[in-house]
């Protein structure tokens, strides 16, 4: 059986360190994966004159999936371009409490599905004599596609409810289209509960009653904001994985940035990167291996064998070694 090619882009700052930790754990398992290393980010820009070389784009295009560490100031030129270049339309942000990690809600388990290609993030802005104007683009095609993805994901994961988040009471045309397409898709899944909330109410409910949610689907800007808010419920961005999924390609990245202030000190928490690898494995139909890593990570966290940000004394690679040890349990 031919190995699946995985493009590996460590990027900048702690991205390099957490990627090393994740690869150490992946290499402990017999996964039939071939890792193709590629370059991108601030250091790449300084060295080559471009933050995202053509050879990196080629590597991503040829790979079954891409693991990405972190990008610094060049993040928009790297990750945003990769999302657009490969039409990675669905951003998946699981929100799940972890054992041994202090958090606001110890039993959370839901997901935010964010449309990744439209909204204000198309970057169509211009100055006017009085200020500036930005164009918000919401299409029926993209709204239907992301709603379809959300229902399919919820069904696959055994969830019973999908909630659309919008502001159609004010943004009547753009969010009106998003809400309309959501309910058209919902009609194809009569066995599932479909609800919708305004984004401001959702921001409150995430704090007061987050257990009510199972799958949230929303537009680009709202999803960006709400998913970071949700990460705060489970301990912060250092514990949050994400996936960017398209029809043909998929890219997996931790939510945290390059954190240059702690880069090179061997204290970066690898949890988000390791959970990101489990999302990749599930996408590649290696669910058993993903669950094995998740259980090993949970044991390590429960034992307090963690990095300083979680109250422990281990370095990045030391924590990775403990997780790898638990893979053998």
UniProtKB/Swiss-Prot annotation:
Source domain of life: Archaea
Record GO cellular component, one term: cytoplasm
Pathway membership, UniProt: Amino-acid biosynthesis; L-leucine biosynthesis; L-leucine from 3-methyl-2-oxobutanoate: step 3/4
Binding site for NAD(+): 257-269
Keyword terms of this UniProt record: Amino-acid biosynthesis, Branched-chain amino acid biosynthesis, Cytoplasm, Leucine biosynthesis, Magnesium, Manganese, Metal-binding, NAD, Oxidoreductase
Catalytic activity: (2R,3S)-3-isopropylmalate + NAD(+) = 4-methyl-2-oxopentanoate + CO2 + NADH
Enzyme Commission designation: 1.1.1.85
Cofactor(s) needed by this chain: Mg(2+); Mn(2+)
Cofactor note: Binds 1 Mg(2+) or Mn(2+) ion per subunit.
Location(s), subcellular: Cytoplasm
Main location per the UniProt record: cytoplasm
Any Gene Ontology biological process: isocitrate metabolic process
InterPro entries xref list: IsoCit/isopropylmalate_DH_CS, IsoPropMal-DH-like_dom, LEU3_arc
Residue intervals passing through the bilayer: none
Chain residues that bind Mg(2+): 200, 224, 228
Family annotation (Pfam families): Iso_dh
Top enzyme category: oxidoreductase
Main function: Catalyzes the oxidation of 3-carboxy-2-hydroxy-4-methylpentanoate (3-isopropylmalate) to 3-carboxy-4-methyl-2-oxopentanoate. The product decarboxylates to 4-methyl-2 oxopentanoate.
Similarity comment text for this entry: Belongs to the isocitrate and isopropylmalate dehydrogenases family.
Name assigned to this protein: 3-isopropylmalate dehydrogenase
